[in-house]
Regions:
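Bacterial N-terminal signal peptides
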Residues: 4-14
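Short, ordered, surface-exposed loop/turn motifs in non-cytosolic proteins
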Residues: 308-329, 347-348
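Beta-strand-rich domain onsets/edges
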Residues: 266-300
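Extracellular beta-sheet/turn segments enriched in Thr/Pro/Gly and aliphatic residues
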Residues: 282-295, 360-380
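A short, amphipathic beta-strand motif
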Residues: 299-309
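Hydrophobic/aromatic-rich core segments of domains that either
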Residues: 142-149, 159-171, 175-176, 181-270
């Protein structure tokens, strides 16, 4: 009898351990991430335990690839809601079943793009965006519709007066203003909310040294780019920055083009507002943008028109000289700072650039070079 009691006690003691072991279904990368969670470990384990079995791969992906700061702060309710809504969207759209698992996990599921404030934007964007894309047949078509409609609805536009470069959607909506990065975050999140794989892409500095830029790539049987809040009626893979991107240099850290990734990689996405922060993984995608430089036979003139307070103005601009009949409209404050009206002119010739009744005489330089011409228009 004593032996039986001893064996029974041993079996009973073993049962909780066995059950506990079975409940911990996750793999080594998740276990390693949990070790970095500190006091928040219980919240992550709660999310892992509660997630439906058909969503386990997604929750494991998130936890295994989270930045340390998120491991130590994000709560189970946040993670469970984010994951559930991502799967819900996948079932609601025509293209959901065709999205490769790799793109779903890395470019639909994640709750953040770079280092913006973490917030549960997915529910609001799902409700706003699903009616916009409901009749679309492809993720690319859906992205185009969102880019053409959402910013008007949200009343958010580009502005250098925004509070921060890396604003979350709610921060940009509250101000009605955002940087190219803030606009890209909104478009990426809106796309992800309706199962359009999307990611931020950018360069720390154009090769011509006219500044940095951020835009969006969406997946539709391959990656395609678009400028956030800059939809081109002709479709994806068009934008004012195409020429600048063609000059990118893959092996130059500051002049290369990077796509942000949630999944860990061996390089980081340069955050121009926080260059010491190397916590956002990235992929160098310069090869898809850079083109062999054809020998140029013209001199490029980029025109900026401003008022007395240096605010950019959208006004008619003409160029007269050897080559007549050139005209266009300068960019106003709602256009990206680096988006300038461009004229390709014969080299070493004299021209007159006119805007708002103000004339400026210029002499073009050598072929292949460029110059920014700024014209200040007096107040009316």
């Amino acid at each position: 009898v004593g032996i039986r009691v001893t064996l029974l006690a041993a079996l009973l003691a073993a049962c909780p351990a066995t059950a506990d072991s079975a409940a911990r279904w996750w793999d080594a990368p998740v276990a390693d991430a949990l070790k970095k969670a500190g006091d928040n470990r219980a919240e992550l384990e709660k999310a892992l335990a509660a997630v439906p079995k058909d969503q386990r791969a997604a929750m494991a992906f998130l936890v295994a690839n989270m930045p340390d700061g998120d491991l130590q702060k994000l709560k189970s309710d946040f993670l469970l809601a984010n994951t559930d809504l991502a799967y819900k969207a996948r079932k609601e759209v025509a293209w959901g079943k065709d999205i490769p698992e790799e793109q779903f996990l890395n470019d639909v599921l994640p709750y953040a793009n770079v280092d913006e404030t973490r917030e549960l934007w997915r529910k609001d964007f799902f409700e706003r965006c699903l009616p916009i894309v409901k009749e679309c047949k492809t993720p690319g078509e859906a992205a185009q519709k969102l880019n053409g409609n959402l910013f008007k609805t949200l009343k958010v536009k580009y502005s250098t007066e925004r509070k921060a470069a890396n604003q979350s959607p709610s921060e940009s909506i509250a101000q009605g203003k955002a940087s190219c990065t803030g606009l890209s975050i909104i478009l990426c999140d809106a796309c992800r909310a309706v199962c359009v794989p999307a990611r931020l892409v950018g360069t720390p500095l154009w090769a011509n040294k006219r500044g940095n830029h951020t835009w969006v790539e969406v997946w539709d049987n391959g990656w395609h780019f678009t400028g956030a809040c800059e939809p081109d009626p002709s479709g994806l893979d068009r934008g004012w920055f195409v020429g600048d991107a063609a000059q990118a240099k893959k092996d130059s850290f500051e002049h290369a083009i990077y796509a942000a990734s949630f999944k860990k990689t061996d390089q980081h996405f340069p955050l121009v507002w926080a260059m010491r922060n190397k916590n956002v993984p990235a992929e160098n995608v310069t090869d898809r943008y850079a083109k062999p430089a054809a020998k140029s036979e013209t001199f490029r003139v980029l025109v900026r028109v401003v008022d007395s307070s240096k605010k950019r103005l959208a006004v008619a601009v003409t160029v007269t000289g050897e080559k007549t009949g050139l005209s266009g409209t300068s960019r106003g404050e709602s256009a990206d700072t680096n988006d300038l009206l461009t004229f390709d002119l014969p080299p070493a010739k004299e021209f007159v650039v006119t805007a708002g009744g103000v004339e400026k005489k210029i002499t073009t330089g050598k072929a292949g070079e460029q110059r920014v011409v700024e014209i200040q228009v007096p107040a009316k």
